[in-house]
Amino acid sequence: MNEQELKQMIEGILTEMSGGKTTDTVAAAPTKSVVETVITEGSIPDITEVDIKKQLLVPEPADREGYLKMKQMTPARLGLWRAGPRYKTETILRFRADHAVAQDSVFSYVSEDLVKEMNFIPVNTKCQDKDEYLTRPDLGREFDNEMVEVIRANTTKNAKLQIVVGDGLSSAAIEANIKDILPSIKQGLKMYNLDFDNIIFVKHCRVPSMDQIGEITGADVVCLLVGERPGLVTAESMSAYIAYKPTIGMPEARRTVISNIHSGGTPPVEAGAYIAELIHNMLEKKCSGIDLK
């Protein structure tokens, strides 16, 4: 088959496909549409301001009211939806935003202005920076000789109670709760004729650092208020670790813990009153942790 025959065959096929119409058609030149860009001044809504307890993304749920009632009972991410095999964009963005807040809380420091405002006694463990704090938890439990002298010089020897504040794994937890919980503890202790004076602030703090403080000060009870590891629900959760005459290397069972102290958990004012009661009971029974009945 030569070129001429091939050309005739193609023309025949095209004629059959067009229903026998052989009139030439001229394709219209495409026209360019003009899209006008409108720039408006405004702000992008903050996705973290959405209350996920009230947000239901499931389309046409069988029991909408029951679903929302269940969501009020937990901060878990229930009632999400998907686009094919993946979560919707809004859900993914909220997840990443909450994760970023948690990361920021771990790697940031408690404001020095807050430490000065609260008249804390600032000390530092043997950790030099956040990286060392995260990779060497053993150094976050110990103080060097210089810090030991600072603690000794600014606290009352053999006091009934020594309050300690530590940044821990969440600076946001301290900044969000400390101003409310300390007055509540002090007020609650007045009922038992108890009080505390200078408060130690520990930078790069691990929980067992309270044990060395207990040995340095000789206090009957040491109460450590520390920022807990943040999660996707909140970065502002604080805990109180309380022990009667803590010593270095003591078993963890000797600590009494009140956790989940934040606005969405146990309110700091309520927690402060309970902490005061626990401190009184420890002094009365001379024990703490699982030994405190």
From Swiss-Prot:
The gene is eutC. Keywords: Bacterial microcompartment, Cobalamin, Cobalt, Lyase. Catalyzes the deamination of various vicinal amino-alcohols to oxo compounds. Allows this organism to utilize ethanolamine as the sole source of nitrogen and carbon in the presence of external vitamin B12. Adenosylcob(III)alamin binds at residues 207, 228. This is Ethanolamine ammonia-lyase small subunit. One of its GO terms (cellular component) is ethanolamine degradation polyhedral organelle. Its EC number is 4.3.1.7. GO terms for biological process: amino acid metabolic process; ethanolamine catabolic process. Belongs to the EutC family. The basic unit is a heterodimer which dimerizes to form tetramers. The heterotetramers trimerize; 6 large subunits form a core ring with 6 small subunits projecting outwards. GO terms for molecular function: cobalamin binding; ethanolamine ammonia-lyase activity. It comes from Listeria monocytogenes serotype 4b (strain CLIP80459). It catalyses: ethanolamine = acetaldehyde + NH4(+). Its cofactor is adenosylcob(III)alamin.
